[in-house]
Amino acid sequence: MAPTLLLLLPALAGLISVAQGQAFHLGRCPTPPVQENFDVHKYLGRWYEIEKIPVSFEKGNCIQANYSLMENGNIKVLNQELRPDGTVNQIEGQATQSNLTEPAKLGVKFFQLMPTAPYWVLATDYENYALVYSCTTIIWLFHMDHVWILGRNRYLPPETVTYLKDILTANNIDIEKMTVTDQVNCPEF
């Protein structure tokens, strides 16, 4: 057992260095309840990122996502951000509803060779806000959280943000590292 742990330590140290700034925790992923009676058709359209737990692949501001239905029944995901140099960075992926008994548990994939990542809609009223959670368990010992608070507009009232953060804390999801996404003076993409 000890030699196995010694082999894992460098790998774990590498994971921790890659995950700096991200929400990296001991133990397996929490399993919070998702939005009941989720209707993906009402969810489609443009969402603006209001707050998030920082992720290595989002470096800009004015971050937004646009969801549209594809002919094959999957959901096209187009994420866009404004880079510090003024250029627009975008990435396109697909989301699928793999569990029809829990339609708010989607999976999203941006690259063919990458695994599908969880995309769980914990709460939404479809017209104003959405709370999205993603978590990956790493070798049964650690997990990495991703959280996004989204709005149909670039601004959400503070009481709505507090309500959504309360959902997270009630489900043992750490919100300490959440940051506000700059949505001021943003161009239309």
Curated annotation (Swiss-Prot):
Glycosylation sites: 66, 99
Protein's GO biological process: brain development; glucose metabolic process; lipid metabolic process; lipid transport; negative regulation of cytokine production involved in inflammatory response; negative regulation of focal adhesion assembly; negative regulation of lipoprotein lipid oxidation; negative regulation of monocyte chemotactic protein-1 production
Coiled-coil stretches: none
Tissues where the protein occurs: Most heavily expressed in adrenal gland, lung, brain, testis and spleen.
Signal peptide residue numbers: 1-21
InterPro entries: ApoD_vertbrte (IPR026222), ApolipopD (IPR002969), Calycin (IPR012674), Lipocalin_ApoD (IPR022271), Lipocalin_CS (IPR022272), Lipocln_cytosolic_FA-bd_dom (IPR000566)
Modified residues (Pyrrolidone carboxylic acid): 22
Gene3D superfamilies to which the protein is assigned, alphabetical: 2.40.128.20
Disulphides: 29-135, 62-186
Pfam hit, one: Lipocalin
Cellular component GO terms held in the UniProt record: cytosolic ribosome; dendrite; extracellular space; neuronal cell body; perinuclear region of cytoplasm
Subcellular localization: Secreted
MF terms in GO: cholesterol binding
Keywords on record: Disulfide bond, Glycoprotein, Lipid-binding, Pyrrolidone carboxylic acid, Secreted, Signal, Transport
Described purpose of this protein according to its UniProt entry: APOD occurs in the macromolecular complex with lecithin-transport and binding of bilin. Appears to be able to transport a variety of ligands in a number of different contexts.
SUBUNIT field: Homodimer.
Similarity-based family: Belongs to the calycin superfamily. Lipocalin family.
Descriptive protein name: Apolipoprotein D
Gene: APOD
